A protein has these predicted regions:
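Conserved AMP-binding/adenylate-forming
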Residues: 120, 180-217
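Conserved S/T- and glycine-rich ATP-binding loop of Class I adenylate-forming
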Residues: 31, 37-40, 73, 78, ...
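Conserved AMP-binding/adenylation subdomain of ANL enzymes
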Residues: 55-72, 79-185, 193-196
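Conserved AMP-binding A3 loop
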Residues: 32-58
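Short hydrophobic/charged patches on amphipathic alpha-helices used for structural packing
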Residues: 20-23, 109, 189
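Conserved pre-ATP/AMP-binding loop-to-beta segment of ANL
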Residues: 5, 9-36, 43, 66-72
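Alpha-helix/helix-capping structural signal
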Residues: 52, 125, 205-206
Length: 217
């Protein structure tokens, strides 16, 4: 990366107006990328994406899930998919967030724990795998630990239900939730690697409402 930056600095010395010239040569309606569909319903089709469409989407996304250069994200879905191009690559370019690339698909759980992303986007199958990992660890825990988890997740789900219903969480339940997080739930988040996450995003396929409720808890 340092060598690449050095090449860029040298190029800038001999071509000081290169960026302005290249920007001026492109219009918002020009083709930015060509992304092929998966081919599940027929032959793969090349979807044309103009610059204005990509910029409009990224700006809109940032109003809902605001990122900045303090955020860390992960890239593990194929870049041939528009979801990873937009939510990972282009969104990080737009906001300055750090984009970490996983070593390979098999190391995703390990890399999540290592990086602890602040914004994490994944398909439902990944969220299901993380949940299954927690359940497997729970089976190997002591009876006391299992009882503590059952109480803590119950408190968290009561809070989640009230929040989803737009209702106020009573002071007593808020206190219980703080205790549940300190004793149990924060450790579950660390086990997955989402203890720093401000936003968890899912898409591309249906996800179980109960699984969403569990993560909210």
């Amino acid at each position: 990366l340092d060598a690449l930056r050095a090449l860029g600095r040298e190029h800038a010395k001999t071509h000081p107006n290169a960026l302005k010239e290249r920007t001026a040569a492109v219009s918002p309606d020009d083709l930015a990328i060509l992304v092929y569909t998966s081919g599940t319903t027929g032959k793969p089709k090349g979807a044309m994406h103009a610059h204005k469409g990509l910029v409009y989407t990224v700006r809109g996304y940032n109003t809902l899930i605001a990122r900045d250069d303090n955020d860390e994200c992960m890239c593990f879905l194929p870049l041939c998919h528009i979801a990873e191009r937009m939510g990972g690559e282009y969104f990080s370019l737009y906001t300055g967030a750090k984009l970490n690339f996983v070593e390979n698909p098999e190391t995703v759980p390990e890399n999540v724990r290592e990086i602890a992303p602040t914004v994490f986007t994944a398909v439902p199958r990944v969220w299901e795998k993380f949940y299954s990992g927690v359940m497997i660890a729970l089976k190997e825990a002591s009876a006391t630990q299992q009882a503590a988890y059952a109480w803590a997740i119950g408190v968290g789900q009561r809070v989640a239900d009230l929040v989803l219903a737009g209702k106020e969480v009573p002071a007593g339940l808020r206190l219980q939730f703080r205790i549940a997080r300190a004793l149990v739930l924060d450790n579950v988040r660390k086990l997955i690697g989402i203890h720093r996450s401000r936003f968890l995003v899912t898409g591309a396929a249906p996800i179980s409402p109960e699984l969403v409720r569990w993560y909210l808890a």
